[in-house]
Each structure stands twice: as structure tokens, then as C-alpha cells.
Amino acid sequence: MEQGGSGYRIEIAPNNRAKCKGSLCGRSKILAGTVRFGTFVDSGRFQSWAWKHWGCVTPRMLKNIKNRLGEDDIVNSLDGITALSQEWIDKVVDAINEGHVSESDERESRKLGEKMNVNSQKLKTSSPPKVVRKNKRHHTTVKSVLSDSDLDAEFTDGSEAYEDD
């Protein structure tokens, strides 16, 4: 883990490309200028960072950070923390020591998730989708996707599908 150091990193997002791996925000994009928390991932084929909004960091992650880095010198052990403002450094150290992020940061992540849910709601259709298939005898089968049996299938005469040209 030569690139990852401790395996954890906190920084200000330089761009809007990363998506949050947390579920609290609905996996929304991490906007440029916001604080993000990364976990180093080494899959064998590639190495990368899995990013989360600071408000999406779970108590279990904070416990693992505390166990790996120790309580004594979090500021010197956590990658990227020294580039943050003193206010954010205090916030991060307090969260690691307490075992959870502050309520206000969690609220911000929940707001992102609510915005995403409102924007991504789809209109409900009145009828379920249908699948149309042709079998070997050129019969057209129309069947509801939701039905489990062929009892709902409708058969038509195959002669109308193939007329002389």
C-alpha cells in the first residue's frame, strides 16, 4: 500500500467527478470544494480510492481508523488532513475520537440524498410493460412481464405477419 500510506485520506474535492460510495446521500456526486473521505482500494488489478462525503462516513469506519492510526497522533497519521483548515481538522479529530460524525454533517448528506430522490423519480405507467416474442411457428406471444405463467399469453395467426411481397 505504498500510495495509500495509512489507507485513509481526507481532502477537499478538486472536481465533480467522484461519486460517493455511501448510501446516506443516495450515491450522489461529490461536488468540487467539499470535504471528502477516501479509503484505499487494492483489487490486485488496479489501485484506487473509494470516496465518500464526510457526512456519509460510518461509525464503523471511524472505529477502524482509530484502531489503525491510534488516538495519539491522528493529525500526523491521516493523509491530507494537514491541508484542511483548523476548523475541519478539529471536526475530523473529534469525530474519530467520538466514533461518529457530527449531526450537522449527516444532515447535509441526507439533504443530498433527498434532492437526488426527488429528481430521479419516474412517472408511473398505468399498464405493466409487455414482452412480445415470436416462437418457431411464427405465433406472436404477448405476455406481461409481471406474469409468471403462459396462461396470460395471446396467440395470433402467423399468416398476417408474413404476406406475399
UniProtKB/Swiss-Prot annotation:
**Acidic residues: bias regions:** 149-165
| Polar residues compositional bias, start-end | 117-128
Q: Where are the zinc fingers (PARP-type)?
A: 8-100
GO cellular component terms, alphabetically, are: cytosol; nucleus
Basic and acidic residues biased stretches:
100-114
**What is this protein identified as?**
PARP-type zinc finger-containing protein C13F5.07c
Q: Where does this one sit in the cell? A: Cytoplasm; Nucleus
Per its UniProt entry, which superkingdom is the organism in? Eukaryota
The Basic residues compositionally biased stretches are 131-141
Record keywords: Cytoplasm, DNA-binding, Metal-binding, Nucleus, Zinc, Zinc-finger
Q: Which GO terms describe its molecular function?
A: DNA binding; zinc ion binding
Region Disordered: start-end pairs: 100-165
This protein's species is: Schizosaccharomyces pombe (strain 972 / ATCC 24843) (Fission yeast)
